[in-house]
Amino acid sequence: MTKIAAETLPDAHFSMTWGPANFGFSAEKIAPFVPYIKQHNFHHYLLNDPAIIALLRKIQTEKGLVTSIYECSTNIRELLHTYFRLHPWNARINHFDCLGFYTFTQTNWGRPGASDWKRTLQGAITYRSDDHCIPSIRMYALMQGVTDIRYWDALLPYQNDPETAAFLKTAPAKVLRDKHDPEQPDRFRAEAVKLLKKLTK
């Protein structure tokens, strides 16, 4: 079906969300779809599979294909640091083009708790209020992570500087490796600021 659709509508942008392994997705099952799908959205749990990582790297070398990573926990007690703030770090280190969550905002679908601040039935990071969205603390933690990456980006033009190059070679990986330490991203920012001050004098 996917092959027929892609051949019938060659200019269409087909995307696929590859859920966690318990949905039965594996590198072997995903690979046949690669020639026909323009955007591949991977659940973050899939990155624990070396075969998926190898396939992901192959997809990322193909011109015109987009890769993204998403999370979708419905647990209101997910750790703000490891689950939300580090989500952008995980996306950047794994070379994804974009990141997301299964649901951005909870909506009034008649379900109990659909707009209840005490529940997040589909892993949403904002709440709906009439025609507006109200950010949750989860959204603010995600924004912290996005800002962390902006500090990283600010250093990229200075990679010819040996100190900056050495920092960028090890520091980002350390943030994810030591994810039990919520102060790691703040230390990264502080060091990035020091380097930027020195480099932009």
For each predicted feature, which ranges?
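Catalytic domains of carbohydrate-active enzymes that cleave complex glycans
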Residues: 1-31, 111-201
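Catalytic-core regions of glycoside hydrolase
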Residues: 1-112
